[in-house]
Amino acid sequence: MSIQIKQSTMVRPAEETPNKSLWLSNIDMILRTPYSHTGAVLIYKQPDNNEDNIHPSSSMYFDANILIEALSKALVPFYPMAGRLKINGDRYEIDCNAEGALFVEAESSHVLEDFGDFRPNDELHRVMVPTCDYSKGISSFPLLMVQLTRFRCGGVSIGFAQHHHVCDGMAHFEFNNSWARIAKGLLPALEPVHDRYLHLRPRNPPQIKYSHSQFEPFVPSLPNELLDGKTNKSQTLFILSREQINTLKQKLDLSNNTTRLSTYEVVAAHVWRSVSKARGLSDHEEIKLIMPVDGRSRINNPSLPKGYCGNVVFLAVCTATVGDLSCNPLTDTAGKVQEALKGLDDDYLRSAIDHTESKPGLPVPYMGSPEKTLYPNVLVNSWGRIPYQAMDFGWGSPTFFGISNIFYDGQCFLIPSRDGDGSMTLAINLFSSHLSRFKKYFYDF
């Protein structure tokens, strides 16, 4: 699909901001490699009624000048996003130098319908998300890049490339929400807090009370037929309607379970089982379920301040044999998921922070495979708490929000419906030879 870059602007904060180095926590640094950005897209379809898309300050649909001016103002309180990475000894820091965030304006000759259901893939990422040149070193590239793309149908997309060392998805949403509010002439909803050293530094001396297997590298054990480099991976979307989710829950035997199982726990367990079956693994093989968890509500001694703008993502891990996943009831599997999630309390998370300090140079735990696979494991990331409907810049709420590209086999995202109808979308990357079998097992209940 064709894409033409019309203009690129380095947007700097509208006012003077603190010129300092920002200490990064171990949790900031361990979630991704420093030479990477996370891509996501918002889709806005132009309403049929022109009166529905009139911004109070502009008659143009998604006026780039308004977005750039608002972005410049949003970067004042969120000033680390306008900085650059640097190395201080053996640690990365953010140099808050106000060099700016990149804003790209682009046009495509295609219509939004050409992308179908907006399933993540290389082409969608290429067209809608700005690219980054990492070749000039760690301090050369922006930590935030945004692309406004106009399509022939009149619709637009806003693609984000956000650096995970700066913040996690929830904090990035707060930035986007503030940017959108400013574009409408409103004040930001909250004041961001950037001090990670005060709130998430390790204890001295460390108090490591648990084994923290989630930080062990997940080394892939690919079978020979997947090692030839010729086996493709495929990314696709699977939708579970509210009725299907209810049917799945009705399969549960809750007679001996005194705690209610959440929708995420049930669906994550179902995905775990379905992937293990689709891969055709032997019954004795172990398969891990990896679940990124927002720790904001779990850290309480002391609690994090509202508006904390860093990474608070921790990993919960379940382990089971393929035979157990296949033979045991879904209730048992979902119970294991619930137990793993409940274990991430304040005591455990503080211990995890101390553990990372005791292991200098700890590798990114689940993103270190040159084959870009988690095989035989699976990662289920929930975006259910990101209220993307609030990202209204003055021309209406987005009709779609999702990940732009999933690079690793076994990695998936659960995203709730924007319509609030109780349905969920699963975006997943699997080896192509496993995908059709996964679909069969995923809908077989």
Swiss-Prot record:
Cross-referenced Gene3D superfamilies: Chloramphenicol acetyltransferase-like domain
InterPro entries per UniProt: CAT-like_dom_sf, Plant_Fungal_Acyltransferase
One of the record's GO molecular function terms: anthranilate N-benzoyltransferase activity
Catalytic activity: anthranilate + benzoyl-CoA = N-benzoylanthranilate + CoA
Induction / repression: By fungal elicitors. Elicitation triggers a rapid, transient induction, reaching maximal abundances within about 0.5 hours and returning to basal levels within 4 hours.
Post-translational modification: N-terminus is blocked.
EC number from the UniProt entry: 2.3.1.144
pH dependence per the UniProt record: Inactive below pH 7.0.
PANTHER family given in the database record: SHIKIMATE O-HYDROXYCINNAMOYLTRANSFERASE (PTHR31642:SF11), TRICHOTHECENE 3-O-ACETYLTRANSFERASE (PTHR31642)
Family: Belongs to the plant acyltransferase family.
Name this polypeptide is given: Anthranilate N-benzoyltransferase protein 1
